[in-house]
C-alpha cells in the first residue's frame, strides 16, 4: 500500500500546522505582494481579519484625520468600530445629521490624513478595479487624502484584469444593488445587463495600475472572505 503524501507547513506566528487553504492563500498573497510592490504600492498580508484590524490601526497615529468609503469589508471586520475607540478625528458620514452634513463630510474626506476602503476586485498581477455610483470613493482613491489603505479579502482576487472587471460587474454590483434596494436590472436577476438605468450604481469604472506617488496606497490582503 502506497502512503499518501500530505503537504503541510508550520505557522510560526500561531504555532500550529497550516491548512491547505491557508498555504494556498499565503502563497498567492506572497506573489501578489511582489506584483503590487513593482507597481509602487506598499503591501502586506494578514491571514485573518482580526490581524488586519491590528495592522491597519497601527498604521494610523493618534490625532490623525481618517475617513472611509462605503465598504462592507472595513465595517464587517470591525475596523471602523476599533477606530471609534481611539483618539482620532473621524470623518464618518454615517453619523451625519442630514444630507448637507453628509455632503460636507464627503468633501472633507479629500483632506484626510488616511482614507480607508476596499476594492471590488484585484487581479493577480496587482491591478485594482472599482465601480462607483457617485464617484466619491474612486475620486478619493485617485487624489486627495495623504494615504489610502485598501483592505481586500482574497475572495476578490481574479486571474487577470478582464476577470477582475467581470467580477466587479457581475458579482459586486448586483449584490450592492440588492443591498441598497436599487431598481436596476441586475437587482431583478443578479446578472449585469450593462444598463443605463437612471438608478445605476455603475457610473464610474476605475482601474488603478500603479500607486502614484509611490507609496501613497497600501494594500492589505486578508486571507478571509470579506465584503462583496
Model-derived features with residue positions:
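Glycine- and acidic-residue-enriched helix-capping/strand-helix junction motifs
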Residues: 17-25
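Conserved phosphate- and dinucleotide-binding cores of soluble alpha/beta proteins
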Residues: 110-228
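N-terminal start-of-chain detector that recognizes signal peptides
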Residues: 15-18, 37-40, 87-90, 101-103, ...
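N-terminal active-site beta-alpha-beta segment that forms phosphate/nucleotide-binding
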Residues: 25-106, 110-116
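Active-site-proximal helix/loop capping residues that flank conserved catalytic or ligand/cofactor
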Residues: 4, 34, 50, 124-126, ...
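Flexible, glycine/proline-enriched loop segments at strand-loop-helix junctions
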Residues: 19-20, 94-96, 148-155
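Short, positively charged and aromatic/hydrophobic N-terminal segments
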Residues: 4-7, 11-14
Amino acid at each position: 500500500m502506497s502512503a499518501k503524501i500530505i503537504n503541510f507547513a508550520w505557522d510560526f506566528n500561531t504555532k500550529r500546522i497550516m491548512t491547505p487553504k491557508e498555504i494556498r492563500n499565503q502563497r498567492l498573497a506572497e506573489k501578489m505582494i511582489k506584483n503590487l510592490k513593482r507597481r509602487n504600492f506598499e503591501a502586506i498580508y494578514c491571514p485573518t481579519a482580526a490581524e488586519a484590524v491590528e495592522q491597519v490601526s497601527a498604521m494610523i497615529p493618534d490625532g490623525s484625520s481618517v475617513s472611509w468609503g462605503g465598504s462592507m469589508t472595513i465595517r464587517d471586520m470591525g475596523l471602523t468600530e476599533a477606530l471609534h475607540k481611539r483618539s482620532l478625528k473621524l470623518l464618518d458620514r454615517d453619523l451625519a445629521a442630514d444630507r448637507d452634513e453628509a455632503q460636507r463630510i464627503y468633501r472633507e474626506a479629500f483632506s484626510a490624513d488616511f482614507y480607508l476602503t476596499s476594492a471590488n476586485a484585484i487581479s493577480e498581477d496587482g491591478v485594482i478595479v472599482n465601480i462607483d455610483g457617485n464617484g466619491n470613493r474612486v475620486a478619493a482613491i485617485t487624489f486627495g487624502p495623504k494615504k489610502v489603505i485598501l483592505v481586500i479579502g482574497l475572495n476578490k482576487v481574479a486571474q487577470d484584469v478582464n476577470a477582475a472587471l467581470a467580477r466587479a460587474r457581475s458579482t459586486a454590483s448586483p449584490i450592492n444593488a440588492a443591498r441598497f434596494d436599487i431598481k436596476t436590472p441586475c437587482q431583478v436577476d443578479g446578472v449585469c445587463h450593462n444598463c443605463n438605468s437612471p438608478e445605476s450604481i455603475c457610473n464610474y469604472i476605475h482601474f488603478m495600475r500603479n500607486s502614484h506617488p509611490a507609496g501613497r496606497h497600501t494594500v492589505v490582503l486578508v486571507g478571509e472572505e470579506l465584503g462583496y
